[in-house]
């Protein structure tokens, strides 16, 4: 009996509870955490408050968290705080920067616990962790999808030399209920709902881009963290709602170059409410046209062999953004500058081993 109790206790131990931070951008009280309490309470939360820093954000009791507002961001980063968006959920990437954990899970505050087809609550975090801890298959598509899941395997004809897979850098989760639409689609399909639950996880093939959504996303911070910059969006910028997609395009180019994998599929969350399509259209208007230039840019982007770290890859991408997308609109020159500033800020707060960080400055070796 004692051994079965011990086994039950071991099974209930949260996976990676000391190695994972949950990052939540918000402008409101976080009552939604009550629904997530059984799954999130053992973890450390990093809350990034957008908007008015004088506003008080209420967090339910019993959660271990840090909360950063705009004043904190300015204090910690100094002049480099200019790279962190204001009045846009892109501010969440500040949480990635200040975290000291190996893994990050980020979720929006309008996302609730979904149920699987049997009616059981879905532990989204547990599935993301499984996705990240198992390899990806970016170099050859497996028709049974993720061969490392229980009940699946490599199919006949899958090269034996590729069956070890590649390290998984990103786990991109999905959603039920309110779709993740652009504003024009939102306007013509106001009653559409995502109701189809697909029990699958797959690796996005090398050379294929995808529209990354930040509302239910996990990643290995050690492998890809510096590439998870959600751009310069929102207040004072000519574009919004492209923050997660920008990060996804940059990340995919870099993971392809470094031989890392990106998974999409399970887990699902319940997206509870639609944002205003007219407000969204104003934010997205330029992006709707610009993306016709952005997609070919990322599809043809190539990184040199010398770019052997995420930071080097990202700085090279920033150069290419300036050289090629700067012709599309002057905003992209500003964005390229912010990409460089982001890497400087990342290295400021995350100095290489053997170096110490100086306040609002570069790292100096001991």
From Swiss-Prot:
Glycans are attached at residue 156. Changing residue 156 to A: Loss of activity. One of its GO terms (biological process) is cell wall organization. The keyword Isomerase applies. GO terms for molecular function: intramolecular transferase activity; UDP-arabinopyranose mutase activity. The keyword Isomerase applies. The record marks 156, 163 as: Required for activity. Disulfide bonds: none annotated. Optimum pH is 6.5. Its EC number is 5.4.99.30. GO terms for cellular component: cytosol; Golgi apparatus. Its main location: Golgi. It catalyses: UDP-beta-L-arabinofuranose = UDP-beta-L-arabinopyranose. Its cofactor is Mn(2+); Mg(2+). SUPFAM superfamilies: Nucleotide-diphospho-sugar transferases. A motif (DXD motif) lies at residues 108-110. Heteromers with UAM1 and UAM2. UDP-L-arabinose mutase involved in the biosynthesis of cell wall non-cellulosic polysaccharides. Catalyzes the interconvertion of UDP-L-arabinopyranose (UDP-Arap) and UDP-L-arabinofuranose (UDP-Araf). Preferentially catalyzes the formation of UDP-Arap from UDP-Araf. At thermodynamic equilibrium in vitro the ratio of the pyranose form over the furanose form is 90:10. Is probably active as heteromer in vivo. Belongs to the RGP family. This is UDP-arabinopyranose mutase 3.
């Amino acid at each position: 009996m004692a051994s079965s109790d011990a086994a039950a206790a071991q099974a209930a131990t949260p996976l990676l509870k000391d190695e994972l931070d949950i990052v939540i951008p918000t402008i409101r009280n976080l009552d939604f955490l009550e629904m997530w309490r059984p799954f999130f309470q053992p973890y450390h939360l990093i809350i990034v408050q957008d908007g008015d820093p004088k506003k008080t954000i209420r967090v339910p009791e019993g959660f271990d968290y840090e909360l950063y507002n705009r004043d904190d961001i300015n204090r910690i980063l100094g002049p480099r705080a200019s790279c962190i968006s204001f009045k846009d959920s892109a501010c969440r990437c500040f949480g990635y920067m200040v975290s000291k954990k190996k893994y990050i899970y980020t979720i929006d505050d309008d996302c609730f616990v979904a149920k699987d087809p049997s009616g059981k609550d879905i532990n989204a975090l547990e599935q993301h962790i499984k996705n990240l801890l198992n390899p990806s298959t970016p170099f050859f598509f497996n028709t049974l999808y993720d061969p490392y899941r229980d009940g699946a395997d490599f199919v006949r004809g899958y090269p034996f030399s590729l069956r070890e897979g590649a390290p998984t850098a990103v786990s991109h989760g999905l959603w039920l209920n309110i779709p993740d639409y652009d504003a024009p689609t939102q306007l013509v399909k106001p009653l559409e709902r995502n109701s189809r639950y697909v029990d699958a996880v797959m690796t996005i093939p090398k050379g294929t881009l995808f529209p990354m959504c930040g509302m239910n996303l996990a990643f290995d911070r050690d492998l890809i963290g510096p590439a998870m910059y959600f751009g310069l969006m929102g207040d004072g910028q000519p574009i919004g709602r492209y923050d997660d997609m920008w990060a996804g395009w940059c990340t995919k180019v870099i993971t392809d170059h470094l031989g890392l994998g990106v998974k999409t599929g399970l887990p699902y969350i319940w997206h509870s409410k639609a944002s205003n399509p007219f407000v969204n259209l104003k934010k997205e208007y330029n992006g709707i046209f610009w993306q016709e230039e952005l997609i070919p840019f990322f599809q043809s982007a190539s990184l040199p062999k010398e770019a052997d770290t995420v930071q080097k890859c990202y700085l090279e991408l920033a150069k290419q953004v300036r050289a090629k997308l700067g012709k599309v609109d002057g905003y992209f020159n500003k964005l390229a500058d912010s990409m460089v500033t982001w890497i400087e800020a990342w290295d400021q707060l995350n100095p290489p081993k053997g170096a110490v960080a100086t306040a609002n400055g570069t790292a100096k070796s001991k």
